[in-house]
Amino acid sequence: ERGGQRLDLTPPAAIVVPAVSTVTAPAPAPPEQPLGKFQMTFYFIIHEAEMDGPRPAGANGGAANDNAEVSLASVGAPLTVAAPAPDLVPLNDQACVPLAHVTRAFAAQVSMQGTGKLRDGRLVNVATRCQCGRPCFHIVPSHREWGTGGSGRSLVPFRSVAVDPAVVKMGSLLYIPALDGQRMPGPRGVGGFVHDGCVVAVDTGGGIDGHQLDLFVGRRAYYKALARRGGSHSWSKRVEVWSGSGRCEQKGGKLRRTAAAI
């Protein structure tokens, strides 16, 4: 007791502090790295009918893989054999068996572009292995509407690029500021959208060397539509290319800019 009053020496009740839950912050996106200045060129599916016009007379109505007939009846042989029109050359498969006979000009273009559509509707891609003395081709499955790249992945207009694998790793997401904000030509579902600059490296090519990339644009008409005044593509001759790993993403088979980068 103190001063006639009893002192309460009971210790105060402990103060309970509620536990604080720890929230783990998402890992920061990897920093974007500049890859340097690149020359950007373009490639597309070359259409036999658009390039060659009507098939030369004598080529059996213009079917891509039909041949002119040569009759041997005049020399006593009751036999009719097929022979290609003199200005046509074969597009061989990997077994060196002709898939079609086409003009030399179309053969040269489809070898350079990598993908072509024949008059009969078949889509052909350059094959990676060939022992025929000239480029070989294979028929592209119908569900791959735009062909395939060197990686085996489907090409997508305005999103797929061909690169030199010694400079850019296959499968890399890239960001090209020169494309960002440009409206792409073509109907909705193919083009008709404002580009966000995101592309992916899925293809290669014999003509792609060093700091060069080739943007797949689908059709020749879309390539022409990307030209500036006077039909010039000079705007693409020297463009900045960045790693897109922190800005671009692929979800559900679609390539787009990440929400954080919008």
Residue ranges, per PLM feature:
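Solvent-exposed, well-ordered loop and adjacent helix/strand elements within mature globular domains
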Residues: 2-262
